[in-house]
Amino acid sequence: MTRVAFLGLGRMGAPMAGRLSNAGHDLVVWSRTRTHAEALADRAEVAGSPAEAGSKADVAVTMLADGAALEEVVLGRDGLAGGLGSGSLLIDMSTTGPAPARKVAKALEERGVGFVDAPVAGSIGPASEGTLAIMVGGPDEAVERARPLLEVLGDPQRTWHVGPVGAGQAAKLMVNLVLGGVTVAVAEGYTLGRLLGLSPDDALDVLEGASVATQTVRSKRDMLRSGDYGHPGFRLALMHKDLRLAVDAARAARASLPGTERVAELYAGAKGRGLADQDYAAVAAYLASMAPLLEHTPPES
């Protein structure tokens, strides 16, 4: 089995690392919050730095917050790049946008280290079950080398090699752009239905059964009905970050996404009302706060 370094053991990274361990891979782990790494000490070696983790592995997997975190962990002081040997491979599964992926890939290429960007779609449940959707960018040889690990972490039928380095990030931004917009549409539709006198259950039954957003309604129904968004599958702050990455990527390509810019502003407003660490569907609570006849309003920050 492959000796794997896993860096970034947050809500998604921890169950993903656990799956690799359960599949029989030798694991060395590192996380900025050391207690997260120590929680896996019974089945993985805990490294003191990214460089140490990289020096003990053939393949490294990163699951980090954003592009800045990726660059710091890989290229910074005591970074992963200093530990990975020539011929090793980094699979970055964070959502960073294409530019950081390409920057890190170029720096690693100069050291003889391969790179694949493989951001995921899915929340904690799919991460634990190994059913994540994965969008992959990188050279054919590197992707094929990564594939056995990706098949442990995700659904092979929903793992797409979409192009060179950075293409996986482009695909992920596309997916979350649509998801963020659909969620706002569902939230506004639900708000309108309630304002016009529909009961919560009737409004949600119709939205789930008759709209193109059926999957979003089904997955968020209980949250919308109760107004409790405190057990996030995907945090609102991260959805906002991904939407901003999409807007920035379009601007870099000399294009604009006016609808997405407005959607991003709504998520920013929800963040400003103290909902950053709630599920991203809490944008519905922010919208409800603009409709004072409704009962669920977000807390003040």
Tell what function each PLM region has.
Residues 167-287:
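Helical "substrate-binding/catalytic lid" subdomain
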Residues 27, 46, 115-116, 200, ...:
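Hydrophobic beta-strand scaffold residues
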Residues 50-113:
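Rossmann-fold NAD(P) dinucleotide-binding segment
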Residues 11, 15, 59, 65, ...:
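Amphipathic alpha-helical hairpins
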Residues 1-63, 88, 93-94, 158-159:
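NAD(P)+-binding Rossmann beta1-loop-alpha1 motif at the extreme N-terminus of oxidoreductases
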Residues 64, 95-177:
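Rossmann-fold dinucleotide-binding core
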